[in-house]
UniProtKB/Swiss-Prot annotation:
PSII is composed of 1 copy each of membrane proteins PsbA, PsbB, PsbC, PsbD, PsbE, PsbF, PsbH, PsbI, PsbJ, PsbK, PsbL, PsbM, PsbT, PsbX, PsbY, PsbZ, Psb30/Ycf12, peripheral proteins PsbO, CyanoQ (PsbQ), PsbU, PsbV and a large number of cofactors. It forms dimeric complexes. A core subunit of photosystem II (PSII), probably helps stabilize the reaction center. The chain crosses the membrane at residues 7-27. It is a single-pass membrane protein. It comes from the Bacteria. This is Photosystem II reaction center protein Psb30. InterPro entries: PSII_Ycf12_core-subunit. It is found in: Cellular thylakoid membrane. It comes from Parasynechococcus marenigrum (strain WH8102). Keywords: Membrane, Photosynthesis, Photosystem II, Thylakoid, Transmembrane, Transmembrane helix. Belongs to the Psb30/Ycf12 family. GO terms for cellular component: photosystem II; plasma membrane-derived thylakoid membrane. One of its GO terms (biological process) is photosynthesis.
Length: 35
């Protein structure tokens, strides 16, 4: 079960980075008033 939890944790972290990356970039540009 430990291995499964590790895989799920890694997949969750990867998904979080994939979703948060563009969101952070969007927020940075939005706060700069570039959009």
């Amino acid at each position: 079960m430990g291995i499964d939890f590790h895989l799920i944790a890694n997949f969750g972290a990867l998904a979080l980075i994939t979703l948060a990356g563009p969101a952070v970039i969007f927020i940075l540009f939005y706060r700069r008033g570039a959009l």
